[in-house]
């Protein structure tokens, strides 16, 4: 590639961890002299960071390759991420793809751009075996967000029968506490108000690099130290496995200076029989206990739940076990995933395949339940004065923000409020599902 080509565009699919890693790749290119442009603008390089959790994510990758080619038919298209690690040769056949980088290679993107030329032939693949991906590369996102996604852990040693993530990201391994604190301090210096801790299985934090299974530190050690970082107003824990969410961590959050009362805890099924087939490491009793513990010490905490419908062997009766379990549980919202067959997973060989139409029906039922749960939770927060962090987006003259316990609110756009925390009274639930706010006396005193 000639030296005058200095623009790059990025698009991220999937989880918060991917967003953190895209930002790290973007900083590498920026430091090398590439200006960042929007993905629908003309660029010399288009980097697409892919997901492969669902079948839709695979298809979305192909759609965004077409977007890049529409923006600049001569632009170089580079594919990284989980899909790139799992199916590099398949991706290399997609029209417009020039380079495919695996889990190990994506953080050395610059070394693969020299002499890379646009071609009508299949893309070039650089992808190691996943067993070679046993090191840790720290990452965090910075950009147009008011929050940063800070990567503290990668990979997973669990063997859930539906999941390809261990095949795409390798063994569980963690950053050191020293590096995490250094990255958190860098984020604070950029006036970012909120950090979201991310990883594949962050509750497993502490395992070292290169196959060292001994926990040098625990997740509790990590959050205890992060709570001391100056300049960060909020720290939010992303998804954490219920069997790894200990009482001590819950209690620390309840008394914390910066950790907010918001937990996202994967359930996947409310049927113990299905959980066993999934090879999850808990049953519903433990899950219910974790929710009860949170509610005991933080009555107003937001509790999000991942759930999969249509897993093989999920009969109507077992699905209703899940539905009723969630309906009775004091949770806040659901992230609903419809089971899709993934190559090289145990679940694809299981009996009791649920018809696709039935999967869609169950998905709809759970989404309706999620909305009901969220609105009921929002109702309990009306009339309270809560701190709101306002985001950058200006949508039809409105701006949006979140309380510490993840209530989404809106008001008329005010550029002076962007990336600011204001104490506001929560008034009423609006037709779009957000909550209106008004200034509080506490906010008036803060400005005085």
Segments from the language model and where they lie:
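Conserved loop-to-beta-strand segment in the C-terminal subdomain of adenylate-forming
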Residues: 261, 342-348, 435-437
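Residue-level signal for inorganic ion chemistry
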Residues: 47, 82, 109, 197, ...
């Amino acid at each position: 590639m000639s030296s005058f080509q200095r623009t790059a565009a990025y698009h991220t699919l999937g989880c918060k961890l991917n967003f953190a890693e895209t930002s790290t790749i973007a900083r590498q290119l920026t430091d090398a002299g590439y200006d960042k442009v929007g993905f629908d603008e003309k660029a010399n390089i288009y980097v697409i960071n892919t997901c492969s959790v669902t079948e839709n994510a695979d298809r979305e990758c192909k759609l965004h390759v077409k977007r890049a080619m529409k923006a600049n038919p001569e632009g170089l298209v580079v594919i990284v991420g989980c899909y790139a690690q799992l199916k590099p040769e398949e991706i290399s056949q997609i029209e417009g793809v020039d380079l495919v980088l695996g889990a190990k290679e994506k953080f050395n993107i610059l070394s693969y751009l020299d002499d890379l030329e646009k071609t009508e032939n299949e893309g070039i693949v650089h992808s190691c075996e996943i067993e070679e991906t046993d090191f840790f590369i720290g990452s965090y996102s910075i950009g147009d967000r008011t929050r940063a996604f800070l990567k503290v852990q990668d990979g997973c040693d669990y063997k859930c029968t539906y999941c390809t993530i261990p095949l795409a990201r390798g063994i569980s391994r963690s950053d050191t506490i020293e590096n995490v604190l250094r990255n958190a301090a860098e984020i604070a210096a950029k006036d970012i108000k909120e950090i979201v801790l991310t990883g594949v299985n962050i509750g497993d934090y502490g395992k070292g690099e290169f196959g060292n299974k001994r926990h040098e530190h625990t997740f509790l050690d990590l959050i205890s130290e992060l709570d001391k970082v100056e300049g960060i107003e909020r720290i939010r824990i992303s998804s954490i496995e219920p069997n790894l969410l200990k009482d001590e961590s819950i209690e620390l959050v309840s008394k914390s200076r910066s950790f907010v009362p918001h937990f996202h805890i994967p359930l996947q099924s409310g049927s113990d029989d299905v959980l066993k087939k999934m090879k999850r490491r808990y049953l519903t009793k433990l899950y219910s206990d974790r929710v009860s513990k949170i509610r005991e010490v933080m009555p107003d905490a937001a509790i999000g739940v991942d759930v999969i419908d249509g897993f093989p062997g999920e009969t109507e009766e077992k699905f209703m076990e899940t539905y009723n379990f969630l309906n009775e549980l004091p949770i806040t919202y659901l992230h609903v995933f419809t089971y899709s067959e993934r190559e090289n997973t145990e679940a694809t060989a299981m009996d009791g395949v649920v018809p696709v139409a039935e999967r869609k029906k169950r998905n709809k039922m759970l989404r309706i339940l999620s909305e009901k749960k969220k609105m009921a939770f929002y109702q309990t927060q009306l009339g309270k004065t809560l701190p709101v962090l306002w985001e950058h987006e200006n949508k039809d003259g409105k701006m949006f923000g979140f309380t510490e316990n993840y209530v989404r609110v809106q008001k008329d756009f005010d550029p002076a409020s962007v990336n600011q925390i204001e104490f506001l009274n929560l008034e009423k639930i609006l037709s779009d599902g957000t909550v209106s706010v008004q200034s509080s006396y506490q906010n008036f005193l803060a400005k005085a």
